[in-house]
Every structure is written in structure tokens, then in C-alpha cells.
């Protein structure tokens, strides 16, 4: 489907690519994508939800059609500010009052970071008492901890040394850290990912270390969310440790509702039909159910 497009400015002069479908619905769904990819890989969100809600997709800085050095960020919290800029734009331009934050992978960390720590940027944008607060937060594959050998290495890095490494200005691009072959059981997803020039298969070490550092901070304490939270993860995810995701939300966010998809890889929305249908059923039972009931 056709989406309107805009470029909006950030607090520090970057330009964010935003696309949206505004059809006069009460609710908005704001989608934040994962690391190395871009919002164009999530047009299914607009196609799936447009009959129920307005939809906004955007590219984080350094990703897709937004400005900034490719696959790089100096401070991870800049991504949270990007989300804030998009929300502010929708509130001012379209008088948005009801919205759902939908996020995938690194985008889930961005969303959790913003909800947990928005007061650090002195943002009064989200305020429960003033009636401007998410109706729901939906997190797909939040990166509580990397999967496999990468996760094992990350867990052994003391916080002090992680802070030191993440503070280095020197950064190099490396490939192979993210096993994108296992995004989906559908091999075409991997092939299309490689062909897409807006994807980054090489990521800056600075970005990777900022992700690890921020994830450890955010997922070491409760998020402090005051709305329904739904979390979905596949049991065969090779990028995010599904066991660590389940453990965190059971221990520190017990009110969040977990949805574990058996045999699912990292991108459940791009899975083969027998697995993808489980994901779409979850969307029906959570986001669409909320929208229809309000």
C-alpha cells in the first residue's frame, strides 16, 4: 500500500525518514525496526493494521533513508530521542492521542529504554496523568541477551570494562556478528536481506557495544510501564536468547504477557506460514483486540 513520506529533524540536526498511513483512525501504531535494517522491511505492519489504525514507520539514525553514519551510533540513547521526535511530530501534526508502540529486536530495546528513562532527557511527552501514554507496548524479540556464543562472551564482560569499551571513539565495521541466515525458516528472507541496499550487513563495533551496554542497564531493572505489555519471542531465535527474555520479564516485569512461539526464528513476521500464523494470531489477540474494544 502507498505510504506518505516525510523527513523530520532531530534535536541534534539529523534527518529521520518517516512514512505513514493516516486514515482517520483513533489509534496510531508506531513501529521501531531492528539493527542494520530499515522500516521498509516492515511495510507488512501498514498492510496488516491499516484498516484498524493509523500506522507510522521510521528509520532510526544511521539506518535506511535517515541521515547519520551507516550502522553507527555514538550514544544509544540517541535512538530513544529519535523515537521521541517521531512521537512529537505525530502529536503536533495529527493531534495523536492514542497510540501503541510496536517494536522489533533492537527497536524493542529503544522502546524499553525510552519508556524507562525518558525523564533523563527531561521529556514530559509521555505523561499518564495528562492522558498521553501508550495504550499498549508490543515487543518482538527484545535483545535482553544475545543468543549462542556471543551471549556467552557478553555475559562474562565485567560492567567496568563494558563501559570502557563502549566509550571508545574508534570504531570499525565488522560482518558476521548477526547470523542473518537464521532470520526465518524461509530462505528467501535471507536472500532478500542481502540484496537490499538499505540494509547494513556490516555493523560498527561502537554500535554493537552501545547495544550491549544499554541492554545490560535497561534489563537490569523494571521498565516501570503503566500500560499492557506483550512480549513475543521464538524458541529457535539465533540472535536473541529466548530464555533470557523469558527470565527477565518473569522476574522484573511479571505483569507483561509472554508469547513464546515454538520453533520460531528471529523474524516471526517473515516466517513460513505454519509459524507466521501463530504470530498473526497473537497480533489479533493483543493489538487488534485492544483497538476494537476502545
List the predicted regions and their residue ranges.
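Active-site glycine-rich loops that stabilize anionic/oxyanionic intermediates
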Residues: 33-37, 106, 235
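Catalytic nucleophile-loop/oxyanion-hole region of alpha/beta-hydrolase
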Residues: 38, 65-94, 277-278
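Short beta-strand/loop motif that positions the catalytic acidic residue
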Residues: 225, 231-233, 237
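Short alpha-helix in the alpha/beta-hydrolase fold that links the catalytic acid
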Residues: 227, 241-250
Amino acid at each position: 500500500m502507498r505510504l506518505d513520506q516525510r523527513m523530520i529533524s532531530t534535536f541534534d540536526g539529523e534527518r529521520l525518514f518517516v512514512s505513514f498511513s493516516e486514515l482517520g483512525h483513533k489509534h496510531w501504531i508506531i513501529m521501531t525496526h531492528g539493527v542494520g535494517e530499515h522500516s521498509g522491511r516492515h511495510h507488512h505492519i501498514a498492510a496488516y493494521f491499516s484498516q484498524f489504525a493509523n500506522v507510522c514507520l521510521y528509520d532510526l539514525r544511521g539506518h535506511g533513508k535517515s541521515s547519520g553514519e551507516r550502522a553507527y551510533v555514538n550514544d544509544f540513547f540517541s535512538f530513544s530521542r529519535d523515537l521521541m521526535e517521531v512521537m512529537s511530530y505525530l502529536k503536533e501534526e495529527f493531534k495523536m492521542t492514542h497510540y501503541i508502540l510496536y517494536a522489533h529486536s533492537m527497536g524493542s530495546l529503544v522502546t524499553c529504554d525510552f519508556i524507562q528513562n525518558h525523564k533523563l532527557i527531561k521529556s514530559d511527552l509521555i505523561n499518564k496523568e495528562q492522558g498521553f501514554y501508550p495504550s499498549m507496548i508490543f515487543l518482538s524479540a527484545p535483545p535482553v541477551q544475545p543468543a549462542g556464543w556471543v551471549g556467552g562472551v557478553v555475559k562474562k564482560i565485567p560492567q567496568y570494562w563494558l563501559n570502557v569499551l563502549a566509550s571508545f571513539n574508534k570504531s570499525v565495521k565488522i560482518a558476521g556478528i548477526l547470523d542473518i541466515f537464521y532470520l526465518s525458516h524461509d530462505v528467501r528472507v535471507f536472500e532478500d536481506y542481502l540484496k537490499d541496499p538499505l540494509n547494513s550487513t556490516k555493523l560498527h563495533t561502537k554500535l554493537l557495544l552501545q547495544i550491549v551496554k544499554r541492554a545490560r542497564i535497561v534489563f537490569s531493572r523494571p521498565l516501570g510501564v503503566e500500560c499492557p505489555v506483550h512480549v513475543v519471542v521464538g524458541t529457535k531465535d539465533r540472535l536473541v536468547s529466548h530464555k533470557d527474555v523469558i527470565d527477565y520479564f518473569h522476574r522484573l516485569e511479571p505483569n507483561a504477557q509472554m508469547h513464546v512461539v515454538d520453533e520460531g526464528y528471529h523474524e516471526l513476521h517473515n516466517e513460513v506460514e505454519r509459524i507466521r500464523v501463530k504470530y498473526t494470531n497473537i497480533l489479533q489477540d493483543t493489538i487488534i483486540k485492544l483497538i476494537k474494544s476502545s
